[in-house]
Amino acid sequence: MERQPASTGSRQELGRLLEAVLSNRGRANAVFDILAVLQSEDPEEIKEGVRTCSRLFGTLLEREELFVGSLPCEDMALAGSQGATYKYKVWMRHRYHSCCNRLEELLTHPSFQVKELALETLMKFVQLEGAKPLEKPQWESHYLFPRTLFRAVVGGLLTPEDDHSLLISQFCEYLEYDDIRYHAMQVATSILARATSRQPEVSLTFWNNAFTLLSAVNLPLQEHELTNFYVKHAQTSSKWKVVHLKEQRKAFQEMWLGFLKHKLPLSLYKKVLVAMHDSILPHLAQPTLMIDFLTSACDVGGAISLLALNGLFILIHKHNLEYPDFYQRLYGLLDPSIFHVKYRARFFHLADLFLSSSHLPAYLVAAFAKRLARLALTAPPEALLMVLPLICNLLRRHPACRVMVHRPQGPELDADPYDPTEKDPARSRALESCLWELQTLQQHYHPEVSRAASVINQALSVPEVSIAPLLELTAYEIFEQDLKKMMPESVPLEFIPAKGLLGRQDDLCTQFFCLS
């Protein structure tokens, strides 16, 4: 049963208390009554209390009525000989800290609306503290940011107990601001560094929360785009690290390296590798530092190895990384299960990309073509309609491999020289073999597969056939296409059309019987 909203009387009472605190310092003790509402068990009352605290301390920050500097002990300050204004500011700053601490606790409240409102209020305080700092600058133009408060906010999101994916998605709106993004990366790095030091086994919830936050960080491509700051300053200084894209990339790199050095669940490995090539590598200060992570992922096997090859290919192609075993690892992933994995479409898209260079040696391309052809013998029709054009594209790109289709001066073969058990494509002897598998598939039961395999019977056209529309083809789609085909009005069943039940030529029945 849903709770009833807070009564109008309660809201009015909080309004009177707020007005009393802001208008008369002599009634400052009313702030305790406001803070007490934050301890209520009613979510509606808590939300009213949070809104009141937001207006109260937001106004005090703007008026600069909170103590600025290293906060002294409350009891010592009140017992000292300083003036009433000094004591009031110290006392009220302690109440402000109590409010922030309670708001941080509310980030784990069962009600999402309470958590969302607490987050909004804390971020409002971050903005106001940045504009009216509660610490004294060490020198002129010193960059001040409420790091302590902001660290508590991010720490409240990255908890090992509660799934904060929805709340983090709300926080991601603030990551559009360049200063929030920069400090969020720094705080996340420090939290990740302490993650395993406190306890050896870290919960999956923590890693999921961390990945949700990290994957939401997007850096601009040009430094002149760093103009959107959450904390407004009268003027910016080129000495501030937050205004330089180079420093943002360093923070981005440290954050991801700090995350990836831990032993992650396999589900997160896959998510990281899917985002690696377009969301992580382009923004790193030194992309080659990912080589250890990617090579380790390659050793895991299965879909993880497949996804890791994409990042390795980018490092090889764009950053001159030497990795001689790249194509051998790709070759090793070609087994019958590749047609049935979740990432089948992505794998063949990447394989087509990796084998697109015309500078690859002929023996290597021949090994891939032969392995694909051998696997095609047991592949389902939807996979064959994708694999067969890919094999033909390999032959188009590398004319030296066409001897596998037609070898006029070749010797007679009584056995296939290709060794399917050889892991090294250079030793598989694929170039000495032929693609007899394609001729076998010309007798396939599905006419579209038979037609695709028959392409090699003719001279291959120069332009390649795009396999992109075929990557995600399913058996259901093939079945639907067959159902939608328009059949001719009369289906020919014999070479000579029959005329009646006994109308065949040379039929003895027609010679002696007549149906009337």
Curated annotation (Swiss-Prot):
Membrane topology type: Multi-pass membrane protein
> Mind naming one GO cellular-component term on file for this protein?
nucleolus
Localization terms from the record: Nucleus membrane; Nucleus, Nucleolus
> Which segments cross the bilayer?
296-316, 347-367, 375-395
Q: Which UniProt keywords apply?
A: Membrane, Nucleus, Transmembrane, Transmembrane helix
Q: Which GO terms describe its biological process?
A: ribosome biogenesis
Domain of life, per UniProt, equals: Eukaryota
Q: Its principal location?
A: nucleus
The family note in this entry says:
Belongs to the CBF/MAK21 family.
Protein known as: Nucleolar complex protein 4 homolog
Give the source lineage, highest ranks first: Eukaryota, Metazoa, Chordata, Craniata, Vertebrata
